[in-house]
Curated annotation (Swiss-Prot), chain B:
Pfam families: Lectin_C (PF00059)
Organism: Rattus norvegicus
Location(s), subcellular: Membrane
Recorded topology in the membrane: Single-pass type II membrane protein
UniProt keyword terms in alphabetical order: Disulfide bond, Lectin, Membrane, Signal-anchor, Transmembrane, Transmembrane helix
Sequence ranges assigned to domain C-type lectin in this UniProt record: 98-208
InterPro entries assigned: C-type_lectin-like, C-type_lectin-like/link_sf, CTDL_fold, KLR_subfamily_B, NKR-like_CTLD
Protein name, as recorded: Killer cell lectin-like receptor subfamily B member 1
Chief location: membrane
TM annotation in the entry: 43-63
Residues exposed to the Extracellular side: 64-214
Gene3D superfamilies xrefs: Mannose-Binding Protein A, subunit A
Gene: Klrb1
Length: 218, 214
């Protein structure tokens, strides 16, 4: 009888031991799963995800707004067809045509005063090289007559430009004066002490390098 | 001895299953999270897609060529001054009333002789200045316009005097001519003085006619 009791006790012990081990293993698995779940749900990773989303959305929104503004600004300032690309390089208050900048005065003065005023602006009274240029100046001058760079010592001397080059007789100069000016009729001349508005011109430094490639304004 | 061992194994297996299945289930519920996160995620995705579409459309517009305008040089138009009218004395259209005269200011510039002819066609003459007040008024007018004007005063080489178009000789106390006294010289009024210019030169001019009672 005592042998049987001893056997039963040992079997019981064995049962308990095995059960405990198995349960422990199960608990370990559960903990592992728990850890995984916690990691996926953890506030840190969630916040990071939200931040990523937020940043991407903000960046895209800013891009869309910027592009919209750029488009609206662009439409307000249309590109001019056949515009001289060099015009933009003229100083404020000057008008560009071809490779030159022209200034039309508001004040009046005699020819010498006009030339001095142009020299003070690092330029000289206007020269024209072509009929197109002359037509442009006539159109732009408005109703008032303007001194230009043509002059001569007397009615018997040849016409020369303000830069001391000889006039090519491109256009007939009428009138009986010693100084040339632009009128509605073309080029006329008056006495040097009379008062008129004037036109200065200078060349644009950037335009000079592009002279061969600059298209004529039609 | 063999029989008791087999029995023990079977018991253990049953015990394991029963004890270990129940604890994980409540934790699995926690894994799903709340519903609003899902909705927020979906909305975020939709927003992103819309933004990307907008971006592509705008880029497309930018790449397109902008509208083209022809060059135009702004020419300042000359505004005509309003005609001064009175119930008794009236000037023709485009003429200006100055005391007892109607004055016409030319819109273009031409030699003196052409100005004279133009005034004649209008039933008038080139301007004659009667006194200092009239001279001052016209000089102020010249200043405002930024222009000079031929008037009806010319140098007569034979008599070596300046004469008005009505034949009277210039009274040098009234106005003084600045410049040359020589052949082919005509008077040009400016904002400060009266010049002698070449009659062949182009200039604007002023016509006058006596006022008629209407």
């Amino acid at each position: 009888m005592s042998a049987v009791k001893i056997e039963e006790a040992s079997v019981d012990k064995l049962k308990i031991h095995l059960t405990a081990t198995a349960c422990l293993q199960e608990e370990d698995k559960g903990k592992v799963l728990q850890g995984k779940l916690l990691r996926s749900i953890s506030p840190e990773s969630r916040v990071k995800l939200h931040c990523c989303y937020g940043v991407v959305i903000v960046v895209l929104t800013v891009a869309v707004v910027a592009l919209s503004v750029a488009l609206s600004v662009r439409n307000k300032i249309p590109v001019m067809e056949n515009c001289e690309p060099c015009s933009a390089t003229c100083p404020s208050g000057w008008i560009g045509f071809g490779s030159k900048c022209f200034y039309f005065s508001e004040d009046v003065g005699n020819w010498t005063f006009s030339q001095s005023s142009c020299m003070a602006l690092d330029s000289h009274l206007a020269l024209f090289d072509s009929l197109e240029e002359l037509i442009f100046l006539k159109r732009y001058k408005g109703p008032s007559d303007h001194w230009i760079g043509l002059h001569r010592a007397s009615t018997k001397h040849p016409w020369i430009w303000a830069d001391d080059t000889e006039y090519s007789n491109l256009v007939l100069i009428r009138g009986g004066g010693q100084c040339g000016f632009l009128s509605d009729n073309g080029i006329s001349s008056g006495r040097d002490y009379t008062h008129r508005k004037w036109i200065c011109n200078k060349s644009s430094s950037i335009c000079k390098s592009k002279l061969g490639n600059v298209p004529r304004h039609v | 001895m063999d029989a008791p061992v087999l029995y023990a194994e079977l018991h253990l297996a049953n015990t394991q299953g029963l004890r270990c299945t129940s604890p994980p289930s409540p934790r699995q519920d926690a894994c799903w999270g709340s519903g609003w996160h899902r909705v927020a995620l979906k909305l975020g995705c939709v927003g992103l897609i819309l933004l990307l579409m907008g971006l592509s459309v705008l880029v497309g517009f930018l790449v397109q060529k902008p509208p083209i305008e022809k060059c135009s040089v702004a020419v300042q138009e000359n505004k005509t001054e309003p005609t001064v009218r009175s119930t008794i004395l009236e000037c023709p259209r485009d003429w200006h009333l100055h005391w007892n005269k109607c004055l016409f200011i030319s819109q273009t510039s031409r030699p003196w002789a052409e100005g004279l002819a133009d005034c004649s066609l209008r039933g008038a003459t080139l301007l004659l200045i009667g006194d200092g007040k009239e001279l001052k008024l016209l000089q102020d007018f010249s200043k405002g316009k930024g222009q000079q004007f031929f008037i009806g005063l010319k140098y007569v080489q034979e008599d070596k005097v300046w004469k008005w178009m009505n034949g009277s000789i210039l009274n040098t106390n009234l106005l003084r001519i600045t410049g040359k006294n020589e052949e082919n010289s005509c008077a040009l009024i400016s904002h400060t003085e009266v010049f002698s210019d070449s009659c062949s030169s182009d200039n604007h001019w002023i016509c006058q006619k006596t006022l008629k009672r209407v």
